[in-house]
Each structure stands twice: as structure tokens, then as C-alpha cells.
């Protein structure tokens, strides 16, 4: 059990990034209603935060860059918890380092880019010479299940770690609803 074992102390921040440069004629870049960076990637970037910090976030905030068609080409989702925070960065026309960082009071976990495909993660401490490398085995198929399985491996949980619990799915759906309201407000003043 790595993340919640106390090895990195108390988890205070989870940051996940998933970006790619989609072509202009792709669905992600051409469909203002159902394309865009948030709807395309947030189910992946929010998953580590929800799995590690839980569903009881206190506030959600969106920073959104739109193109001239009203497609969100880069969106940051900030979640605030009582004693932690999370940032999910999503992009279809902005490229960034696609890594996952889980910051704690004694160290941090780094899953290098592309973290959603990685087969390893590292634990870093204040002493830069102290780095632990983990290469757990994965089972199951499907992108979301692999990410969830990866997070469960960081947590040290092997049984059914790939399953998204009902309350986690509901929390992520609530964030999606909040995004759709914010997008509508920013684009249409509603």
C-alpha cells in the first residue's frame, strides 16, 4: 500500500493531465456540444482524484479556453476538499506533460507521461537521491479500468480495484453537470 500507507504522508494534492493535439476535423475539435477536452478526457483525469481523495469535494472550479466554434480546447478542473485539492488538466488543442502527481506531506508519487499507459510509478522524497520505483502488474482491459487499476495499485489494493463505485460515478457525473452549466454560462450567458 503506497499512497495511503503513510509512505508519502497525508495526501494533499492530486494532479492529472491528459492532452493531445486533435485534428481540426476530429469530433473532439468540431462538435461544440459533445466534443472538447473536458468531455473527452475528464473521466480519466478526474478518476485519480476521486479514487484517492473521495467524493466529498467542497468546491469545483473550471478554467476553460474555447476556440471560435465554442469547443473547449483546454480545460482545468480544480477540486477543493477539506484538507486537500486536485487538478485535472484536459486538452485537445494544447499539449502538456501528461503525468500524474500525488503530493503528500512526506513525499510524492510520480507516474510519468503518459501516466494512463504507464506500467511504473516512482515515490520521491525530500532527499533527491531517495527514489523508490514500483512496477506492478495489471489485469483487465479498457482504458478507464486500467487507470482505475493503476490507482488501485498505487493504493496497494488488488481486489476489484478497477471497479468504479456508484458514489464515484455519481460524483463524476455531478462534476460533468457543473461543467456543462459553466460552459453554457460562459458561451451563452445563461
Regions found by a protein language model. Name each.
Residues 134-148, 164:
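Active-site loop of classical SDR/Rossmann-like NAD(P)-dependent oxidoreductases
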Amino acid at each position: 500500500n503506497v499512497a495511503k500507507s503513510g509512505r508519502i504522508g497525508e495526501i494533499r494534492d492530486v494532479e492529472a493531465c491528459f492532452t493531445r493535439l486533435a485534428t481540426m476535423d476530429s469530433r473532439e475539435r468540431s462538435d461544440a456540444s459533445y466534443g472538447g477536452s473536458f468531455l473527452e478526457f475528464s473521466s480519466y483525469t478526474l478518476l485519480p482524484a476521486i479514487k484517492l481523495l473521495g467524493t466529498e469535494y467542497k468546491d469545483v472550479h473550471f478554467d476553460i479556453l474555447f476556440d471560435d466554434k465554442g469547443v473547449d480546447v483546454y480545460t482545468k478542473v480544480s477540486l477543493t476538499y477539506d484538507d486537500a485539492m486536485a487538478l485535472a488538466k484536459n486538452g485537445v488543442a494544447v499539449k502538456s506533460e501528461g503525468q500524474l502527481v500525488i503530493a503528500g506531506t512526506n513525499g510524492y508519487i510520480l507516474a510519468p507521461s503518459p501516466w494512463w499507459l504507464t506500467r511504473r510509478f516512482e515515490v520521491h522524497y525530500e532527499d533527491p537521491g531517495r527514489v523508490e520505483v514500483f512496477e506492478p502488474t495489471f489485469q483487465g482491459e479498457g482504458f478507464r479500468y486500467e487507470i482505475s487499476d493503476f490507482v488501485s495499485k498505487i493504493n496497494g489494493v488488488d481486489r476489484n480495484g478497477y471497479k468504479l463505485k456508484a458514489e464515484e460515478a455519481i460524483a463524476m457525473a455531478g462534476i460533468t453537470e457543473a461543467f456543462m452549466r459553466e460552459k453554457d454560462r460562459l458561451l451563452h450567458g445563461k
